[in-house]
Amino acid sequence: MPRSGTFTRPYGCVRTPCHSGRVLQGDMQMGLFSQDITSMDDLYMHTLQDIYYAENQIVKALPKMIKKASNVDLKSGLSGHLEESRNHVARLEQAFGMLGCEVKAVNCPAIDGILKEADEVTGDIASAGVLDAAIAAAAQAVEHYEITRYGTLIAWSKELGHVDVAELLEQTLTEEYAADDKLTALAEARLNMAA
């Protein structure tokens, strides 16, 4: 059973904005504390759109990490996760469809910041071993962000009556935990000592 989010307060029977006839637009710039988020439905859809944006940014960023990595196991693990991330994008598109919503993304400053920091930290490292350790740490920061988002979305999906969406997202959460565990094992067994 995958671990899930900590948001368990019941919100009653609420329909998502899509079911109430309101579609959130992709160019809408909602912040977490935005006045545009006035209900649990709004927050749920914003978070779904947020992780959709994040997964797409991760798909764009992973090839650069793979290219910089020198450790064969790290390259292989990141390459495998790139394929998984592409599947995560497809699953999110499926979730939007299950909710009857148009696929939309909202900017996610959190993932932008994590990826920017990863790029900056790994940009000027001359030692291949240190660079691999930095890449693994950056990839884990990404994994941890994804784990929090998917755990929360699973809990909220269940609370809002979208059990089918929760089950779909649980597949992704399981893969995110597995990727994080592999990165931890690799870092502890090889990368950190080689650095």
PLM regions and their residue ranges:
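Extreme N-terminal basic, low-complexity initiation segments
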Residues: 2-6
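Amphipathic alpha-helical hairpins
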Residues: 13-195
